[in-house]
Amino acid sequence: CLEIAFDENLNVLIGDNEAGKSTILSAIDIVLSGSRNKVEMYGLQSLFNKEIIDEFLNSSKEITNLPKLEVELYLNDQNNMNLEGNYNSLQESGHGLLLTCEYREDLTKEINEILNQEEANFPFEYYSIDFKTFSGESYTGYRKYISHLFLDNTQINSEYATRKYIKTMYQAN
């Protein structure tokens, strides 16, 4: 579990390469966007902690011990009742958004077949991707609660990416 308290005015993330700075920003972007496509673009295998996956694969591989990914964004009061509630890990009233990725219980039989194989396969494709507000209401990329802009200069490497970047800039204003 990683918890980061941000200042409301300015925050600077400093660290060595591969320390997780971009991962933190990407997680925030994914939750704010409510986009399943973004999750699939990154791939669940890159969002989960590699050590947690390896630890599971080296264990007895019980389906009930499959890791679960949760990203919670606690927000200041947004004057939006849809964001307010206690549907969060602390079960405390607040404003926020939540991404949950967990194995689908309706696919237990198929998942067990994969886990019982000799080779170390993790069943990422049998995970659900769920976006909810702290009120427990589902949301998607079509119903964004907060406008945001995520600039990643490593992705601006083509004419298409540049046009998309400029379009996003104008939409944020």
Segments predicted by a language model, with ranges:
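Short mixed-charge
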Residues: 47-56, 109-114
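Intrinsically disordered, low-complexity, mixed-charge
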Residues: 58-66
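Short beta-strand or tight-loop elements
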Residues: 49-52, 67-71, 95
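Short structured motifs
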Residues: 54-59, 82-86
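Structured loop/turn residues at beta-strand edges in well-structured enzyme cores
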Residues: 8, 67, 124
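Pre-Walker A-like glycine/lysine-rich segment at the N-terminus of P-loop NTPase domains
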Residues: 1-33, 42-53
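Electropositive, glycine-dotted interaction segments
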Residues: 70, 76-173
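Beta-strand-rich, non-transmembrane domain signature
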Residues: 37-39
